[in-house]
């Protein structure tokens, strides 16, 4: 009799355990009533002829994915859309920041996309993963996001540039308020968007979330490091937030007739300067980048492009008043670029507009250079014959205009 009662009690206890196990997701959900949502982003990165990358952050741990559909006029729910997961070599990533690269696309083609995530309530290593609710971008009350891949056959290109905003998010919102209406092919942030790389929130709060809301969910955003992106404890995480087509902070892309060359100018002071905290090694970095640059300039893709434009945050200034970093660029990069048929270089760094015509003493340049002012907008249009530049002041009034004939 005693054995019989003990068996019954054990069975009841086991039943309670099974019941509690089954209720665990509901218990965890009740303990964490916050719903999964897109907290920051999305924003586009590394848009190429056959690919694009979407980045965003959720408010809690989750797995994330992107669903895509051609911009063919059909409803997004017309059919099952392919899912592309934030994953690492076959395993979905669990976290808050998500990054999804989508490849195998057609050049010059518009694609709609939907951002999705499923909350993770419990991750017990090898034992089990308990999921909560899933949700994503609302395609019932809002149109899906849309991106167009790059197209080298396009006859012209229109783009915008901003640099040296240094936490002036309100000025960025003014400068790029009409970015969607102006239908830029892309936007380039050409360095020093913040004074330091403090943490993820600091970057989102000071410019990246505004960029997402104003244009970067649908218009490609390209980034170029300035000297200040090298500073701060989050600096080595730069590539996590801003992936590129090369996997390095220097890269190239082609839109329409223009071959764009993005060069990372590095730090402005010597590596051993006391203010660099004994943490910089940019001499080595610039040497590595220089070898990459030689290969780019020797490529048929570069040589055959009708127009060639360089983005570089620090100008290649070799005048007597220049600093170490700009002198290094002048000494080591300009000899290569001067023989490469460059049509225009766009820089920042000096927080003041300056036009540097070809053959300016101290710059040793065979092509024009525009040093763009801080925290204002530059717009450019180019075809195979002409490059047109307009810069604006902080009240959004046109300030400088330049037109350049493309070298043949």
Name each model feature, range by range.
Residues 276-278, 282, 300-344:
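Active-site-proximal segments of metal-dependent phosphoesterases and phosphodiesterases across multiple
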Residues 15-26:
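Bacterial N-terminal signal peptides
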Residues 155-230:
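Conserved, compact domain cores that house catalytic/ligand-binding motifs in diverse enzymes
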Residues 115-146, 202-298, 332-338, 354-385, ...:
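Extended active-site neighborhood of metal-dependent phosphoesterases/phosphodiesterases
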Residues 28-160, 180-181, 383-408:
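Acidic, histidine-bearing metal-coordination/catalytic regions of metal-dependent phosphoesterases
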């Amino acid at each position: 009799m005693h054995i019989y009662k003990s068996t019954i009690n054990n069975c009841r206890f086991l039943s309670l355990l099974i019941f509690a196990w089954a209720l665990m997701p509901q218990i965890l959900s009740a303990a964490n009533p916050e719903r999964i949502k897109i907290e920051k982003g999305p924003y586009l990165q590394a848009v190429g002829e056959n690919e694009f990358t979407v980045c965003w952050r959720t408010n809690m741990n989750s797995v994330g994915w992107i669903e895509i559909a051609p911009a063919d006029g059909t409803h997004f729910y017309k059919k099952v859309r392919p899912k592309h997961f934030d994953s690492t070599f076959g395993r979905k990533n669990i976290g808050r920041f998500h990054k999804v690269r989508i490849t195998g696309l057609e050049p010059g083609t518009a694609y709609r996309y939907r951002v999705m995530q499923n909350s993770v309530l419990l991750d017990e290593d090898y034992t089990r993963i308990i999921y909560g609710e899933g949700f994503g971008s609302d395609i019932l009350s809002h149109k899906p996001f849309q991106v167009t891949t790059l197209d080298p056959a396009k006859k012209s290109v229109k783009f915008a540039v901003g640099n040296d905003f240094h936490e002036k998010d309100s000025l960025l919102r003014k400068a790029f308020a009409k970015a969607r209406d102006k239908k830029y092919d892309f936007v380039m942030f050409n360095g020093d968007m913040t004074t330091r790389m403090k943490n993820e929130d600091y970057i989102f709060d000071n410019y990246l979330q505004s960029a997402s809301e104003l244009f970067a969910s649908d218009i490609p955003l390209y980034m170029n490091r300035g000297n200040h992106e090298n500073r701060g404890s989050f600096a080595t995480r730069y590539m996590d937030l801003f992936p590129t087509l090369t996997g390095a902070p220097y890269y190239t892309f082609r839109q329409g007739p223009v071959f764009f060359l993005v060069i990372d100018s590095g730090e402005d002071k010597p590596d051993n300067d006391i203010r660099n905290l004994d943490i910089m090694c940019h001499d080595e970095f610039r040497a590595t980048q220089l070898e990459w640059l030689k290969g780019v300039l020797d490529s048929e893709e570069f040589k055959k492009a009708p127009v060639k434009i360089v983005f570089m945050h620090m100008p290649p200034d070799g005048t007597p008043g220049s600093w170490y970093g700009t002198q290094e660029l002048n000494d080591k990069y300009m000899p290569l670029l001067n023989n490469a048929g460059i049509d225009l270089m766009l820089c920042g760094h000096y927080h003041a507009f300056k036009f540097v015509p070809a053959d300016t003493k101290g710059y040793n340049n065979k092509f024009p250079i525009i040093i763009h002012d801080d925290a204002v907008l530059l717009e450019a249009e180019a075809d195979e014959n002409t490059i047109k530049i307009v810069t604006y002041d902080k009240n959004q009034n046109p300030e400088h205009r330049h037109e350049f004939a493309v070298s043949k």
